Regions:
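Short hydrophobic/aromatic-rich beta-strand motifs
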Residues: 1-2, 66
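Gram-negative bacterial Sec-dependent N-terminal signal peptides
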Residues: 2-31
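Acidic, Gly/Ser/Thr-rich repeat motifs that build Ca2+-stabilized beta-propeller blades
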Residues: 34-206, 259-263, 267, 342-390, ...
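Short, flexible loop segments at the rims of nucleotide/cofactor-binding pockets, characterized by
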Residues: 43, 172, 238, 397-399
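Short, cationic motifs built from Arg/Lys/His that form the positively charged side of catalytic pockets
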Residues: 75, 144, 217-220, 407
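Beta-propeller domain segments
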Residues: 94-105, 109-111, 119-121, 191, ...
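Conserved RecA-like P-loop NTPase ATPase core
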Residues: 186, 249, 411
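Conserved blade-ending motifs and adjacent loop-strand segments that build the rim/top face
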Residues: 392-415
């Protein structure tokens, strides 16, 4: 039986406001967002409100929207406006027909990514990434469920990935609590049909370059959790590994023409990155101490060094602890964007397509949640990043928002062509070019 929540659905569009103009010049990794006017006028409406830390969204073609809340669970918004709760955390405030007794929320961990099987019409499968204490120590898992025909419930839980590490102990670092650097975005690539799973380093210096620990990786698997046969990791690596050597991948999107995977990743108080992935590639993140000219670091993890308690010049910090360490790993995948050297909480990204987007048709839209710590500008915004045929950045524009700035957690283009944006304050917003 479905459970309708008390949340409010708004179906009316908001007031029209200007977006940003896309004429700012930006070159490769030093691309810097500029504000201005633009030909794309955006309207905003609150699509869903009253949520608790909404984390991700996934749409069906008719507008049915699955969404997760980090400490609540999985729900589905029907085209009628009704919300059915499906899978809840044990301590969720709302009533859920199914409770995952082993699931939990802690720090950055909880119920994170959600993805819909490309063959949903035939198999009714939906996938969720969540922290679980079913094993000891706790891990992150990717779970598959079968959705009822009327979307009132889910059943047939199958854990297709069970061994993504979760940070079990606090460490002596900024933001060093349990559950940190947890990754969690999951997406199907429409080109190859595989599920891509992003994971984080847990503030553990051994994880990024480990061949067998599944943190700091992008996994490429089928719907049963098996490695894609085309994966080409280095010898000795877990065959599910598509790429490795990452810090904390928060977003992944696929180019609308080539289906090339592109990730968004938090930097270590400098240099958020966007990177075009290469099968078997190394992201170049290696925060171990006593290597690359570094000495001892707190708890053996140099990810916030040097001067981890204050805001050292970001370029000095980058020289000491590079996000992509080309000196140690000369063949590492180069980022195509580094946020002008800042770390401001790069999160999810999505490509938008359709003539309604004008010059932004085919652009990559990326949300930044903002940091504002140690002298870093907060930087809450959505950047419009335009790529050339070689997937290099040629222009970056800061979108002038028809809504207040916020912690932009998830960006997804809906089947209607609009942009849907989940923010930590508890809303999902719909942004659309004027007249849609």
């Amino acid at each position: 039986m479905s459970t309708t929540t008390s949340r409010t659905i708004h179906n009316l569009r908001g007031i029209c406001s200007v977006a940003a103009l896309g004429t700012a010049t930006a070159l490769a990794t030093d691309a810097t967002a500029q504000s201005g006017m633009n030909t794309t006028m955006l309207e905003e409406s609150i699509y869903l409100e009253g949520l608790s830390d909404p984390w991700d969204m996934a749409f069906l073609g008719d507008g049915t929207m699955f969404f997760t809340e980090k400490c609540e669970g999985l729900s589905v918004l029907m085209p009628s406006g009704e919300v059915n709760t499906l899978l809840g955390m044990p301590e969720a405030e709302d009533s859920y027909p199914v409770a995952g007794d082993d699931l939990f929320c802690d720090g950055q961990a909880g119920m994170n990514g959600v993805a819909i099987d490309p063959d949903f019409d035939e198999n009714r499968f939906v996938y969720v990434y969540s922290a679980s204490n079913m094993s000891e120590p706790p891990t992150n898992r990717v779970m598959r469920f079968t959705v009822a025909d009327d979307f009132s419930s889910i059943a047939d839980r199958t854990d297709i990935v069970t061994d993504i590490p979760y940070k079990t102990e606090a460490t002596d670092h900024p933001f060093g609590g349990t559950g940190a650097h947890n990754g969690g975005r999951i997406r199907f690539n429409p080109g190859d049909g595989y599920l891509y799973v992003t994971t984080g380093d847990n503030h553990n210096p051994e994880i990024p370059q480990s061949p067998t620990i599944m943190g700091s990786k992008v996994l490429r698997i089928d719907g049963d959790g098996n490695a894609a046969p085309e994966n080409n990791p280095p010898e000795g690596f877990d065959p599910r590994t598509y790429t490795y050597g990452h810090r904390n991948v928060q977003g992944i999107a696929f180019h609308p023409e080539t289906n090339t995977p592109i990730i968004m990743e938090h930097g270590p108080w400098h240099s958020d990155e966007i990177t075009v992935l290469e099968n078997g590639g190394n992201g170049g993140w290696d925060p171990r101490d006593n290597m690359a000219g570094r000495g001892d670091c707190p708890d053996g993890y140099c990810g916030y060094m040097p001067n981890q308690g204050e805001g050292m010049n970001r370029y000095e910090r980058a020289a000491f602890m590079p996000m992509t360490d080309f000196e140690t790993y000369p063949d590492a995948m180069p980022p195509i964007w580094t946020n002008n050297g800042w770390s401001q909480g790069t999160s999810s990204g999505t490509f938008v397509t359709g003539e309604q987007w004008g010059d932004w048709d085919g652009a990559l839209l990326v949300g930044l949640m903002g940091i504002g710590f140690g002298g870093t500008p907060i930087g809450q915004r959505i950047d419009v990043i335009q790529l050339d045929d070689q997937l290099s950045v040629f222009d970056v524009t800061e979108m002038t928002l028809p809504m207040p700035s916020a912690r932009f957690r998830s960006l997804v283009q809906g089947p209607d062509g609009a942009l849907y944006v989940a923010v930590d304050s508890g809303e999902i917003h719909r942004l659309a070019p004027s007249g849609m």
